[in-house]
């Protein structure tokens, strides 16, 4: 496989074929919590993409100099430093969104996607491939968040990115918002539906029966 094809596979593979949420079922907790609005879903997706990509890059660059006995500590230190930078930038330039995301930006430190890619991929792969892998997994994570956020905000509040799309009865319109979709459990069911749809069209992702 040529370098260009391999880079493309690393970048696009996690979006559908190896999606971190839909196939690997990682990072679900934040997906439940931040998808009631598209705005927060988008910002969370961008934050995780940035942290995953740059943590992969930095860890890959020093992978041959990290003692095996302390590799997890080194990985978490790099990831935590990047999360602090992202959190401070959000507080400085998008304070209201930062308040809405609350602790979930900080919890990127413990996100299974970030830690998993650092340990399983960046520690064994050159920097550029690791960087693209981080972006690809961030895009895969973001695709699920945006799909869930789209449904939850549109039918739960009648809006997208805070702009009214479905005119609500309370404002003299026709649409009665479904408040259930604004509750975290609804995201769990929507993610389940997305997994079902993906595995229906890609049966190779269905787990083999024991």
UniProtKB/Swiss-Prot annotation:
User: Which Gene Ontology molecular function entries are recorded, alphabetically?
Assistant: oxidoreductase activity, acting on NAD(P)H, quinone or similar compound as acceptor
- Protein name according to UniProt: Na(+)-translocating NADH-quinone reductase subunit D
> According to its UniProt record, where is this protein located?
Cell inner membrane
The organism encoding this protein is Shewanella baltica (strain OS155 / ATCC BAA-1091)
Supply the EC number(s).
Answer: 7.2.1.1
The similarity comment for this entry is: Belongs to the NqrDE/RnfAE family.
Q: What class of enzyme is it?
A: translocase
* Keywords, sorted A to Z: Cell inner membrane, Cell membrane, Ion transport, Membrane, NAD, Sodium, Sodium transport, Translocase, Transmembrane, Transmembrane helix, Transport, Ubiquinone
Please give the subunit comment from the record.
Composed of six subunits; NqrA, NqrB, NqrC, NqrD, NqrE and NqrF.
Gene name as annotated:
nqrD
Its UniProt entry gives the catalysed reaction(s) as: a ubiquinone + n Na(+)(in) + NADH + H(+) = a ubiquinol + n Na(+)(out) + NAD(+)
Give the membrane topology, semicolon-separated if more than one: Multi-pass membrane protein
Q: What is its main location?
A: membrane
Q: Glycoprotein: is it a keyword of this entry?
A: no
Residue stretches spanning the membrane: 14-34, 42-62, 72-92, 103-123, 131-151, 178-198
Instruction: List GO terms (cellular component aspect).
Output: plasma membrane
Kindly indicate whether the keyword NAD belongs to this entry: yes
Residue ranges annotated as coiled coil are none
Q: Please, which domain of life does this record's source organism belong to?
A: Bacteria
Q: Pfam families of this UniProt entry? A: Rnf-Nqr
Function text: NQR complex catalyzes the reduction of ubiquinone-1 to ubiquinol by two successive reactions, coupled with the transport of Na(+) ions from the cytoplasm to the periplasm. NqrA to NqrE are probably involved in the second step, the conversion of ubisemiquinone to ubiquinol.
Q: Name one GO biological process term.
A: sodium ion transport
């Amino acid at each position: 496989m040529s370098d260009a094809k391999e880079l493309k596979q690393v970048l696009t593979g996690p979006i559908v074929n190896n999606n971190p949420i839909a196939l690997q079922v990682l990072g679900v907790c934040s997906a439940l919590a931040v998808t009631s609005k598209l705005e927060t879903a988008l910002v969370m997706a961008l934050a995780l993409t940035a942290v995953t990509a740059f943590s992969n890059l930095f860890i890959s660059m020093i992978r041959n100099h990290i003692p095996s006995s302390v590799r997890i500590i080194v990985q978490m230190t790099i990831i935590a430093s990047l999360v602090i930078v992202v959190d401070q930038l959000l507080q400085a330039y998008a304070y209201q969104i930062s308040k809405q995301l609350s602790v979930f930006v900080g919890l990127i430190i413990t996100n299974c996607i970030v830690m998993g890619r650092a340990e399983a991929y960046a520690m064994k792969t050159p920097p550029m491939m690791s960087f693209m892998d981080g972006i690809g997994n961030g895009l895969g994570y973001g695709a699920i968040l945006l799909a869930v956020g789209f449904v939850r905000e549109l039918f739960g509040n009648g809006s997208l990115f805070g702009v009214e799309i479905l005119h609500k009865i309370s404002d003299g319109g026709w649409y009665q918002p479904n408040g259930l979709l604004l509750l975290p459990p609804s995201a769990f069911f929507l993610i389940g539906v997305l997994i079902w749809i993906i595995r229906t069209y890609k049966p190779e992702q269905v787990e083999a029966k024991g």
